């Protein structure tokens, strides 16, 4: 059943690398008829369109530096002011810090009639499952097809089903690198989770389940959060 008549409001989606956040964000957007706003996408879009913020971000990236909070916040602010965000939107990859979360609350409060994010969904996946998903990735250098030796292996070990080329593991998919990324995410996100917990906005979903079950649990969390916000 479509949820396009449900006024869900702003949704924040949290989840570690490998949690399937991007997949779930697209499913949420399609089900409720709201835009999926990924900070990576809007950054690339601003750079491609040559906006003022995009030009500034491009100069920063060309120096090899990280794009500042102010630039990212500005791009998010411009995007959520668009008419297609009036019924709600799902933010993927933002906020990453408490400072960004506080900024988002202020930005939404300034938007006519808006409150804090209706619900913050945290897709929780066990450490071992994340390691399997990320370290098991193998890529075809010819067509870019991605396999997973644990979850979606090629028909013949080590070679692409389509062209027969030897698959390779990216340097940043090794266990050492992945383990550090996950620890870094945990350190960064813990304060953010506590921030939203205190607001009673955080809804945790078990991401170890099959995709369809995770999606169903997310929809329930969103609609429960929307109902609670509507009664405030």
Regions found by a protein language model. Name each.
Residues 1-232:
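Glycine-rich phosphate-binding loop of ATP-dependent small-molecule kinases
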């Amino acid at each position: 059943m479509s949820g396009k008549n449900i006024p869900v409001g702003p949704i924040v989606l949290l989840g570690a690398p490998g949690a399937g956040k991007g997949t779930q964000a697209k499913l949420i957007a399609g089900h409720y008829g709201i835009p999926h706003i990924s900070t990576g996408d809007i950054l690339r879009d601003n750079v491609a369109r040559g906006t003022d913020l995009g030009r500034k971000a491009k100069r920063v990236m060309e120096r090899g530096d990280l794009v500042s909070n102010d630039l990212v916040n500005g791009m998010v602010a411009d995007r959520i002011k668009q008419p297609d965000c009036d019924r709600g939107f799902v933010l993927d990859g933002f906020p990453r810090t408490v400072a960004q979360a506080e900024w988002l609350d202020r930005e939404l409060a300034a938007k006519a009639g808006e409150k804090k994010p209706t619900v913050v969904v945290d897709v929780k996946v066990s450490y071992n499952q994340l390691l399997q998903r990320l370290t098991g990735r193998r890529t075809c250098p010819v067509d870019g097809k991605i396999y997973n030796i644990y979850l979606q292996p090629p028909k013949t070990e080590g070679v692409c089903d389509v062209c027969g080329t030897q698959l390779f593991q990216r340097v940043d998919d090794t266990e050492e690198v992945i383990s550090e990324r996950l620890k870094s995410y945990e350190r960064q996100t813990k304060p953010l989770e506590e921030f939203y917990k205190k607001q009673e906005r955080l809804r945790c979903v078990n991401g170890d389940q099959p995709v369809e079950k995770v999606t169903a649990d997310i929809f329930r969390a969103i609609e429960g959060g929307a109902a609670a916000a509507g009664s405030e």
